[in-house]
């Protein structure tokens, strides 16, 4: 009797299910980013409650159409308060959106259907309505800090219904 070939695990190829954040290669780490660019929005913190409020205002380096940094390699030199995500800080940053791939994996949760690692398509994050595309009203250079309260946005802390589905909606 010949031995049956081992059935491949459903987790084969899903490195985020089998590795800790610290075990990931730099390319695996970078690929956890879904490209929503919500982390590139200006945020306000309520001094009394600690609540975080996202705004419609982006970092000056964000290309709001592409949802990508215009100078990713040098972002920390260009923007002094740019936060580089690491395995340590993604576990403690309270402003990462609930849909953030880094946050989900750090919490032991799976990625959504629209994440490019699941869908194979970098546009599904936009199609699901999760990204900042079409929602940025200006950059930090264009809108003064004194006006940020006028630009508070509710959507970054919620997922659109279609993004919450287990699989993509039928067209």
Swiss-Prot record:
InterPro entries: Puta_zinc/iron-chelating_dom, UCP006173. Transmembrane segments: none annotated. PANTHER family: UPF0260 PROTEIN YCGN. Belongs to the UPF0260 family. NCBIfam families: PRK05170.1-5, PRK05170.2-5. This is UPF0260 protein Nham_1404. It comes from Nitrobacter hamburgensis (strain DSM 10229 / NCIMB 13809 / X14).
């Amino acid at each position: 009797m010949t031995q049956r070939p081992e059935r491949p695990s459903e987790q084969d190829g899903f490195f985020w299910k089998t590795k800790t954040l610290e075990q990931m290669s730099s390319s695996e780490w970078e690929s956890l980013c879904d490209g929503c660019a919500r982390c590139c929005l200006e945020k306000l913190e309520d001094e009394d409650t600690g609540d975080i409020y996202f705004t419609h205002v982006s970092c000056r380096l964000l290309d709001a159409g592409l949802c990508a940094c215009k100078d990713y390699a040098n972002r920390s030199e260009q923007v002094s308060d740019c936060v580089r995500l690491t395995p340590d800080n993604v576990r403690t940053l309270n402003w990462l959106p609930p849909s953030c791939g880094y946050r989900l994996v750090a919490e032991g949760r799976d990625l959504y259907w629209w994440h490019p690692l699941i869908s194979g398509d970098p546009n599904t994050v936009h199609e699901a309505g999760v990204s900042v595309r079409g929602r940025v009203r200006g950059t930090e250079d264009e809108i003064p800090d004194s006006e940020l309260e006028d630009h508070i946005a509710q959507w970054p802390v919620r997922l659109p219904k279609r993004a919450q589905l287990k699989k993509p909606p039928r067209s």
